[in-house]
Protein backbone atom coordinates (compact mmCIF):
# COMPACT_ATOMS: atom_id res chain seq x y z
CA UNK A 1 0.00 0.00 0.00
CA UNK A 2 1.46 3.35 -1.06
CA UNK A 3 2.09 6.10 1.47
CA UNK A 4 -0.41 8.97 1.58
CA UNK A 5 0.64 11.98 -0.49
CA UNK A 6 2.44 14.78 1.32
CA UNK A 7 0.88 18.14 0.40
CA UNK A 8 2.45 21.58 0.81
CA UNK A 9 0.11 24.56 0.98
CA UNK A 10 1.98 27.64 -0.24
CA UNK A 11 0.37 31.07 0.15
CA UNK A 12 1.52 33.82 -2.22
CA UNK A 13 1.23 37.24 -0.60
CA UNK A 14 2.02 40.79 -1.64
CA UNK A 15 0.21 43.39 0.46
CA UNK A 16 -2.80 41.15 1.08
CA UNK A 17 -2.42 41.21 4.85
CA UNK A 18 -6.09 42.10 5.31
CA UNK A 19 -7.07 38.74 3.78
CA UNK A 20 -4.08 36.62 4.83
CA UNK A 21 -5.44 35.36 8.16
CA UNK A 22 -8.40 33.73 6.42
CA UNK A 23 -6.10 32.09 3.86
CA UNK A 24 -3.80 30.67 6.55
CA UNK A 25 -6.71 29.50 8.71
CA UNK A 26 -8.28 27.70 5.75
CA UNK A 27 -5.09 25.66 5.36
CA UNK A 28 -4.84 24.91 9.08
CA UNK A 29 -8.45 23.73 9.27
CA UNK A 30 -8.41 21.21 6.44
CA UNK A 31 -10.48 18.10 7.08
CA UNK A 32 -8.44 14.94 7.75
CA UNK A 33 -8.09 12.45 4.91
CA UNK A 34 -5.68 10.17 3.09
CA UNK A 35 -2.92 12.78 2.90
CA UNK A 36 -0.28 14.41 5.05
CA UNK A 37 -0.24 18.19 5.39
CA UNK A 38 3.50 18.58 4.95
CA UNK A 39 3.72 22.31 5.61
CA UNK A 40 2.07 25.67 5.23
CA UNK A 41 4.40 28.25 3.70
CA UNK A 42 3.71 31.96 3.31
CA UNK A 43 5.90 33.70 0.73
CA UNK A 44 5.82 37.38 1.61
CA UNK A 45 6.81 39.09 -1.62
CA UNK A 46 7.89 42.45 -0.25
CA UNK A 47 4.68 43.37 1.56
CA UNK A 48 4.53 46.72 3.35
CA UNK A 49 1.16 46.22 5.07
CA UNK A 50 0.12 44.10 8.07
CA UNK A 51 1.31 40.83 6.48
CA UNK A 52 4.22 40.47 8.92
CA UNK A 53 1.94 40.87 11.95
CA UNK A 54 -0.56 38.34 10.62
CA UNK A 55 2.21 35.80 10.08
CA UNK A 56 3.49 36.41 13.61
CA UNK A 57 0.08 35.43 15.04
CA UNK A 58 0.43 32.03 13.38
CA UNK A 59 4.04 31.50 14.41
CA UNK A 60 4.76 27.81 15.00
CA UNK A 61 2.11 26.65 12.51
CA UNK A 62 3.52 28.17 9.35
CA UNK A 63 6.84 28.77 7.66
CA UNK A 64 7.38 32.34 6.43
CA UNK A 65 9.70 33.30 3.60
CA UNK A 66 10.13 37.06 3.50
CA UNK A 67 12.05 38.88 0.76
CA UNK A 68 12.04 42.00 -1.43
CA UNK A 69 9.36 42.09 -4.10
CA UNK A 70 10.14 39.84 -7.07
CA UNK A 71 6.73 39.58 -8.72
CA UNK A 72 4.07 36.94 -9.17
CA UNK A 73 5.96 34.69 -11.59
CA UNK A 74 9.02 34.32 -9.36
CA UNK A 75 6.83 33.85 -6.28
CA UNK A 76 4.87 31.07 -7.97
CA UNK A 77 8.14 29.49 -9.14
CA UNK A 78 9.51 29.63 -5.60
CA UNK A 79 6.36 27.99 -4.27
CA UNK A 80 7.57 24.80 -5.94
CA UNK A 81 11.30 25.28 -5.44
CA UNK A 82 11.02 25.90 -1.70
CA UNK A 83 8.32 23.38 -0.75
CA UNK A 84 9.08 19.80 0.27
CA UNK A 85 5.80 17.96 -0.29
CA UNK A 86 4.96 15.54 -3.09
CA UNK A 87 2.20 17.92 -4.16
CA UNK A 88 1.85 21.69 -3.98
CA UNK A 89 -1.41 23.56 -3.41
CA UNK A 90 -0.70 27.22 -4.26
CA UNK A 91 -3.04 29.79 -2.76
CA UNK A 92 -3.29 33.49 -3.53
CA UNK A 93 -3.46 35.28 -0.19
CA UNK A 94 -6.77 36.97 -1.01
CA UNK A 95 -8.48 33.60 -1.59
CA UNK A 96 -9.14 30.71 0.78
CA UNK A 97 -9.65 26.95 0.62
CA UNK A 98 -12.83 25.01 1.38
CA UNK A 99 -12.20 22.71 4.40
CA UNK A 100 -12.54 19.61 2.20
CA UNK A 101 -10.11 20.69 -0.55
CA UNK A 102 -7.12 18.51 0.29
CA UNK A 103 -9.20 15.50 1.30
CA UNK A 104 -11.27 15.63 -1.89
CA UNK A 105 -8.24 16.07 -4.14
CA UNK A 106 -6.35 13.26 -2.40
CA UNK A 107 -9.30 10.92 -2.92
CA UNK A 108 -9.31 11.75 -6.65
CA UNK A 109 -5.61 10.99 -7.23
CA UNK A 110 -4.70 8.10 -9.50
CA UNK A 111 -1.33 6.58 -10.33
CA UNK A 112 -0.72 8.75 -13.40
CA UNK A 113 -2.23 11.95 -12.00
CA UNK A 114 0.07 14.98 -11.92
CA UNK A 115 -2.42 17.85 -12.01
CA UNK A 116 -5.78 18.45 -10.36
CA UNK A 117 -8.04 21.43 -10.93
CA UNK A 118 -11.44 22.14 -9.46
CA UNK A 119 -14.23 24.71 -9.51
CA UNK A 120 -14.49 27.78 -7.29
CA UNK A 121 -17.01 29.95 -5.49
CA UNK A 122 -16.62 33.57 -6.61
CA UNK A 123 -17.04 36.07 -3.77
CA UNK A 124 -16.61 39.81 -3.30
CA UNK A 125 -14.10 41.59 -1.08
CA UNK A 126 -16.26 40.83 1.99
CA UNK A 127 -16.70 37.15 1.14
CA UNK A 128 -20.27 37.48 -0.14
CA UNK A 129 -21.26 35.30 -3.14
CA UNK A 130 -21.15 37.08 -6.51
CA UNK A 131 -22.46 34.22 -8.64
CA UNK A 132 -25.38 31.89 -8.02
CA UNK A 133 -23.46 28.83 -9.15
CA UNK A 134 -19.82 27.69 -8.80
CA UNK A 135 -17.44 28.76 -11.55
CA UNK A 136 -14.85 26.65 -13.44
CA UNK A 137 -11.37 27.02 -12.02
CA UNK A 138 -7.91 26.82 -13.56
CA UNK A 139 -6.40 29.78 -11.71
CA UNK A 140 -3.70 29.56 -9.04
CA UNK A 141 -5.88 28.80 -6.03
CA UNK A 142 -7.84 26.02 -7.76
CA UNK A 143 -4.85 23.80 -8.55
CA UNK A 144 -2.97 20.93 -6.95
CA UNK A 145 0.22 20.09 -8.84
CA UNK A 146 2.71 17.25 -8.46
CA UNK A 147 5.94 18.93 -7.46
CA UNK A 148 8.37 16.79 -9.48
CA UNK A 149 6.36 17.34 -12.66
CA UNK A 150 6.11 21.06 -11.96
CA UNK A 151 9.88 21.38 -11.56
CA UNK A 152 10.33 20.43 -15.22
CA UNK A 153 8.29 23.50 -16.23
CA UNK A 154 10.07 26.06 -14.06
CA UNK A 155 10.54 28.97 -14.13
CA UNK A 156 6.96 30.05 -14.80
CA UNK A 157 5.31 33.44 -15.13
CA UNK A 158 1.73 32.23 -14.66
CA UNK A 159 -0.17 29.17 -13.44
CA UNK A 160 -1.16 28.44 -17.05
CA UNK A 161 2.24 26.76 -17.43
CA UNK A 162 1.02 23.89 -15.26
CA UNK A 163 -1.98 23.38 -17.54
CA UNK A 164 0.47 21.62 -19.87
CA UNK A 165 0.22 18.61 -17.55
CA UNK A 166 -3.53 18.49 -18.13
CA UNK A 167 -3.05 18.67 -21.89
CA UNK A 168 -0.58 15.80 -21.60
CA UNK A 169 -3.41 13.63 -20.31
CA UNK A 170 -2.10 13.61 -16.74
CA UNK A 171 -4.77 15.80 -15.17
CA UNK A 172 -8.08 15.41 -13.37
CA UNK A 173 -10.86 18.01 -13.38
CA UNK A 174 -13.25 18.12 -10.43
CA UNK A 175 -16.50 20.06 -10.40
CA UNK A 176 -16.38 20.47 -6.64
CA UNK A 177 -16.04 24.17 -5.65
CA UNK A 178 -13.07 23.81 -3.30
CA UNK A 179 -11.76 27.39 -3.34
CA UNK A 180 -13.30 30.75 -2.56
CA UNK A 181 -12.01 33.13 -5.22
CA UNK A 182 -12.18 36.73 -4.07
CA UNK A 183 -12.86 39.51 -6.58
CA UNK A 184 -11.97 43.03 -5.49
CA UNK A 185 -10.64 46.21 -7.15
CA UNK A 186 -6.96 45.25 -6.82
CA UNK A 187 -7.54 41.80 -8.32
CA UNK A 188 -9.28 43.36 -11.33
CA UNK A 189 -6.33 45.52 -12.47
CA UNK A 190 -6.45 46.08 -16.24
CA UNK A 191 -9.33 43.63 -16.74
CA UNK A 192 -11.70 46.41 -17.76
CA UNK A 193 -9.31 47.94 -20.30
CA UNK A 194 -10.04 46.59 -23.80
CA UNK A 195 -7.46 44.03 -24.91
CA UNK A 196 -5.07 44.25 -21.95
CA UNK A 197 -6.04 41.03 -20.17
CA UNK A 198 -6.29 39.11 -23.45
CA UNK A 199 -2.87 40.31 -24.62
CA UNK A 200 -1.36 39.23 -21.31
CA UNK A 201 -2.88 35.76 -21.63
CA UNK A 202 -1.63 35.52 -25.20
CA UNK A 203 1.90 36.39 -24.09
CA UNK A 204 1.77 33.68 -21.40
CA UNK A 205 0.55 31.07 -23.89
CA UNK A 206 3.30 31.97 -26.38
CA UNK A 207 5.94 31.72 -23.65
CA UNK A 208 4.61 28.31 -22.63
CA UNK A 209 4.46 27.12 -26.25
CA UNK A 210 8.09 28.14 -26.75
CA UNK A 211 9.11 26.39 -23.52
CA UNK A 212 7.46 23.15 -24.61
CA UNK A 213 9.24 23.30 -27.96
CA UNK A 214 12.55 23.79 -26.18
CA UNK A 215 11.89 20.59 -24.20
CA UNK A 216 11.85 18.42 -27.35
CA UNK A 217 15.49 17.40 -27.10
CA UNK A 218 15.10 16.18 -23.54
CA UNK A 219 11.39 15.45 -22.99
CA UNK A 220 10.09 15.10 -19.42
CA UNK A 221 8.74 11.83 -18.09
CA UNK A 222 5.15 13.01 -18.50
CA UNK A 223 5.16 13.56 -22.29
CA UNK A 224 6.73 12.24 -25.46
CA UNK A 225 8.26 14.54 -28.07
CA UNK A 226 5.21 14.06 -30.28
CA UNK A 227 2.87 14.93 -27.43
CA UNK A 228 4.95 18.00 -26.59
CA UNK A 229 4.58 19.20 -30.17
CA UNK A 230 0.80 18.91 -30.03
CA UNK A 231 0.60 20.62 -26.65
CA UNK A 232 2.86 23.40 -27.90
CA UNK A 233 0.53 24.01 -30.82
CA UNK A 234 -2.46 23.92 -28.47
CA UNK A 235 -1.15 26.84 -26.44
CA UNK A 236 -0.05 28.73 -29.54
CA UNK A 237 -3.60 28.35 -30.81
CA UNK A 238 -4.95 29.69 -27.51
CA UNK A 239 -2.65 32.68 -27.99
CA UNK A 240 -4.19 33.32 -31.42
CA UNK A 241 -7.64 33.18 -29.83
CA UNK A 242 -6.66 35.70 -27.17
CA UNK A 243 -5.18 38.01 -29.82
CA UNK A 244 -8.40 37.81 -31.84
CA UNK A 245 -10.44 38.67 -28.76
CA UNK A 246 -8.05 41.51 -27.89
CA UNK A 247 -8.44 43.01 -31.35
CA UNK A 248 -12.23 42.72 -31.19
CA UNK A 249 -12.32 44.41 -27.78
CA UNK A 250 -10.30 47.29 -29.24
CA UNK A 251 -12.68 47.39 -32.22
CA UNK A 252 -9.91 46.39 -34.65
CA UNK A 253 -11.97 43.95 -36.66
CA UNK A 254 -9.60 43.76 -39.64
CA UNK A 255 -6.70 42.85 -37.36
CA UNK A 256 -8.82 40.12 -35.81
CA UNK A 257 -9.72 38.68 -39.23
CA UNK A 258 -6.04 38.48 -40.16
CA UNK A 259 -5.42 36.24 -37.16
CA UNK A 260 -8.20 33.77 -37.95
CA UNK A 261 -6.20 31.68 -40.51
CA UNK A 262 -3.31 31.27 -38.07
CA UNK A 263 -5.71 30.12 -35.38
CA UNK A 264 -7.15 27.52 -37.75
CA UNK A 265 -3.70 26.20 -38.69
CA UNK A 266 -2.79 25.90 -35.02
CA UNK A 267 -6.05 24.10 -34.28
CA UNK A 268 -5.36 21.53 -36.98
CA UNK A 269 -1.75 20.98 -35.91
CA UNK A 270 -2.80 20.56 -32.29
CA UNK A 271 -5.57 18.19 -33.40
CA UNK A 272 -7.82 20.19 -31.14
CA UNK A 273 -11.60 20.66 -31.34
CA UNK A 274 -12.56 23.26 -33.92
CA UNK A 275 -15.29 24.84 -31.78
CA UNK A 276 -13.11 27.64 -30.29
CA UNK A 277 -12.00 28.64 -33.79
CA UNK A 278 -15.61 28.72 -34.98
CA UNK A 279 -16.56 30.93 -32.03
CA UNK A 280 -13.75 33.37 -32.82
CA UNK A 281 -14.69 33.36 -36.51
CA UNK A 282 -18.33 34.04 -35.67
CA UNK A 283 -17.25 36.84 -33.35
CA UNK A 284 -15.27 38.60 -36.05
CA UNK A 285 -18.03 38.17 -38.63
CA UNK A 286 -20.65 39.53 -36.22
CA UNK A 287 -18.34 42.34 -35.13
CA UNK A 288 -18.83 41.57 -31.44
CA UNK A 289 -16.19 40.44 -28.91
CA UNK A 290 -16.84 37.21 -27.03
CA UNK A 291 -16.22 38.89 -23.67
CA UNK A 292 -18.27 41.90 -22.60
CA UNK A 293 -16.20 44.30 -20.52
CA UNK A 294 -17.40 46.36 -17.58
CA UNK A 295 -15.78 48.68 -15.08
CA UNK A 296 -17.43 46.81 -12.19
CA UNK A 297 -15.25 44.09 -10.61
CA UNK A 298 -16.45 40.56 -11.14
CA UNK A 299 -18.95 41.40 -13.89
CA UNK A 300 -16.87 40.66 -16.98
CA UNK A 301 -19.09 38.29 -18.95
CA UNK A 302 -19.19 36.25 -22.11
CA UNK A 303 -21.60 37.36 -24.78
Language model: regions and residue ranges:
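A conserved acidic beta->alpha catalytic loop
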Residues: 44-52, 92
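Short aromatic/hydrophobic "clamp" motif used to bind/position activated sugar donors
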Residues: 88
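Glycine-rich, basic loop-to-helix element that forms the pyrophosphate-binding segment
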Residues: 67-83
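Catalytic core of nucleotide-sugar-dependent glycosyltransferases
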Residues: 181-185, 190-222, 245-246, 253, ...
Amino acid sequence: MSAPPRISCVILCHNYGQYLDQAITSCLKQEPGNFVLQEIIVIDDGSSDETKEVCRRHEGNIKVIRRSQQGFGQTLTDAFLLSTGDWVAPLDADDWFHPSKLRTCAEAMRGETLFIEHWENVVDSHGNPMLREPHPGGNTSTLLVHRDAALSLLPVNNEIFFHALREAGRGIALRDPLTFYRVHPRSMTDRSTPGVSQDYRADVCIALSDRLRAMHENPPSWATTRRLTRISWHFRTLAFGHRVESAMQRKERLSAMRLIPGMLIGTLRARAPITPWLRSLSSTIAGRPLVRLTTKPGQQAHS
